[in-house]
Amino acid sequence: MAVSKNEILETISNMTVMEVVELIEAMEEKFNVSAAAAAVAVAAPAAGAGAAAAEEQTEFTVVMTSFGSNKVNVIKAIRGITGLGLKEAKDLVEGAPSTVKEGVSKDEAASIKKELEEAGATVEVK
């Protein structure tokens, strides 16, 4: 029985972030490809064309560089910000440096940074 694209997309949309990461890794192994190389190849032409036009950055990425001495509070903050489950939030925190959120506004990035720093984490906004 063949599975339709819509069924595959529906299944993936119901997965957690960690499950999607594991799926991507399994696909990379099975098909001997790298998803990162494809993303760089697609993003490279856009970056060259948009560099002159993009004078002011409008989308930011929040990166946690370390969780400091209070890991429990940082995990709680990550769960509140991202909506991740306990295990996924713990894995994200322990995997520092790690991206917390991408493509957020300047105000939202500042708010996330403040919340994580109050919890004890070290955070960068890129």
Swiss-Prot record:
Belongs to the bacterial ribosomal protein bL12 family. Keywords: Ribonucleoprotein, Ribosomal protein. Forms part of the ribosomal stalk which helps the ribosome interact with GTP-bound translation factors. Is thus essential for accurate translation. GO terms for cellular component: cytosolic large ribosomal subunit. GO terms for molecular function: mRNA binding; structural constituent of ribosome. It comes from the Bacteria. PANTHER family: 39S RIBOSOMAL PROTEIN L12, LARGE RIBOSOMAL SUBUNIT PROTEIN BL12M. This is Large ribosomal subunit protein bL12. GO terms for biological process: translation. The lineage of its organism: Bacteria, Pseudomonadati, Pseudomonadota, Gammaproteobacteria, Legionellales. InterPro entries: Ribosomal_bL12, Ribosomal_bL12_C, Ribosomal_bL12_C/ClpS-like, Ribosomal_bL12_oligo, Ribosomal_bL12_oligo_N_sf. The keyword Transmembrane does not apply. The keyword Ribonucleoprotein applies. Homodimer. Part of the ribosomal stalk of the 50S ribosomal subunit. Forms a multimeric L10(L12)X complex, where L10 forms an elongated spine to which 2 to 4 L12 dimers bind in a sequential fashion. Binds GTP-bound translation factors.
